Design a protein with these regions (language model features):
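Ser/Thr-rich, low-complexity intrinsically disordered terminal regions
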Residues: 2-153
Length: 153
């Protein structure tokens, strides 16, 4: 499967923010929301990617990594290349959340960063769903479907 090159502006740059709470609480919230938004029943990444997370116990600082892998349907492990990473660590009196796009394509990558930032701040968000919902309408327009059918009426 060929993928187009990522722009230098979006690949492997880490977006960082400091938030309140504990690493364990921030990890639990980010993981819950990512699984619901990105991998839920109609999540845009459900068929193409695999969610993997590793978290230390709160007694050991609670640091955590969430890594999204490209889905590999080979005979063993379904985790292919790493595509997106969120790291969560204690920093000073807060929690450092680092968000790195490794292989996701735009505009999905930018929307995923927006989602993760919002979740780390305790906000509701699922911007990636708007892109996933817009795709069938755009495809219907390209195929010449009537406007009412494309709008889902």
């Amino acid at each position: 499967m060929a993928t187009s090159a990522l722009s230098a502006a979006t690949a492997n740059l880490e977006t960082t923010l400091i938030t309140s709470g504990t690493p364990t609480d921030v990890y639990a919230e980010l993981a819950r929301r990512a699984l619901h938004c990105w991998f839920g029943a109609d999540g845009p990444l459900k068929a193409t990617h695999v969610f993997y997370a590793d978290a230390a116990s709160p007694d050991q600082g609670g640091a955590a990594d969430i890594v999204l892998h490209e889905r590999d349907d080979g005979p063993s492990d379904r985790r292919g290349s790493r595509a997106f990473r969120i790291t969560i660590t204690r920093e000073g009196g807060g929690v450092r959340v680092g968000i790195t796009n490794l292989r996701m394509q735009e505009p999905m990558a930018g929307l995923m960063v927006q989602d993760a930032q919002a979740w780390a701040r305790g906000e509701e968000a699922c911007a990636t769903r708007t892109l996933a919902q817009a795709a069938p309408r755009a495809q219907a327009r390209l195929l010449g479907a009537p406007a009412k059918a494309a709008a889902g009426r």
